[in-house]
């Protein structure tokens, strides 16, 4: 059996609001916010320092996500933002509020803890694989709405 090395990192400090329009009949259909955070699992062979992933690597990396450093990308996506699905029937109104400076809108294919776990895993995995020439992969992301509710995505 081949040994597998994993390390984890928690990213926190994001105040994020959601609109889950498909959650009809529940209070989650309304705009609501959380102090969200997420945990990332890195897997790969240790480097010359015996590290799978540099715990400060998101700050010291060379690559970018959408033209931003990884931490700036995380802040852009999650810090003091409103997340809405691309098929939200009120998207035009939310875009107008964004245009007026009332909110910072981020439009994603889907929203919710499960959708965010997947989105983060896919984007971070592509970044980390490129940054490490394929030596390390992001194999799991757990997204927390709060300390009691989370969703995990593993491809």
Where are these regions (language model features)?
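Charge-rich, low-complexity N-terminal segments
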Residues: 1-155
